[in-house]
Amino acid sequence: MATTSTVSTSSRLQDAQPAFIYGTAWKKDHTKRLVKEALVAGFRRIDTAAQPRHYQEHLVGEALREAYSEGIVTREDIYLQTKYTTPAGQDLSNMPYDPSAPLDNQITTSVSSSLKNLRQQDSVEVATYIDCLLLHSPLPTIEQTLQAWKLLESYVPNQIRALGISNVTLPILQAIYESSSIKPSVVQNRFYPQTRYDVSLRAFCAEHGIMYQSFWTLTGNPALLKSKPVADLTLAADVGRPVALYALVMDLGTVVLNGTTSSGHMHDDLSGILKVQEWATMKPREWATVSASFRGLIDHSQI
């Protein structure tokens, strides 16, 4: 019987909580401090990966355990996701599994490492649960991708609550969806012109209740930052251009990866989205106009 997870796909701008997920890539030894700062600022979704080349998953776990013990958050407050990364995405001298092992062994070893790194308490060996585990990318063949997915299904719903995939095309996502018992709950992709902003893929996600997460939202979109809808919202809501772009992307039904290393920006981004929400509530017609203008740019890549 096909099932889906309980991951909420709601991410419109009007949501009470800004639709950000804190990204922990490239934070190196600063990971623990930055994750705690993000939690203090108000972030409640955390993204990491079992990929020591770019992520320090164990430091994410340390930050979370300290935050739990200090009463900053409870485990139930947090949405926590990590990833299995194939050998092609790893530093072969520092990875969480043996790249020469069979695929199933690679995955089970990686997942075991993540469960230990992200455990809720120091005194227990494994995490109570991980909210979502993503394939960091499709595997070299669709057959291998489906094999990996089937193995991950065995962890749901106990140690892993939901499954997802990153860096995926629509045909591969459709193949997974059609072949799986546990349907994809999350897709995390670059949001930029080269993929035409994943218009068709995002439509598929919306139709099937899949949370679409964007990364490279700022760095991949210098033209969008300069676009008229972003400029208009910046002026009308009295926020910075990055916040205006974030808000408009969220209104597409997207959860935005935010990896800022500035505590000030953490607070400003969260409070800025709330400021746009307030303005949109007070000025619904003006908001509808700027939102429609932005959607026109995205849907037709007119930038």
Which residues make up each language-model segment?
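Beta/alpha (TIM)-barrel catalytic core signal, keyed to glycine-rich beta->alpha loops juxtaposed to Asp/Glu
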Residues: 112, 119, 123, 127-131, ...
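Non-membrane alpha-helical structural segments and their capping/turn regions in soluble enzymes
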Residues: 32, 54, 101-108, 142, ...
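Glycine/small-residue-rich loop that forms an oxyanion/phosphate-binding "nest" at active or ligand-binding sites
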Residues: 90-120, 132, 142
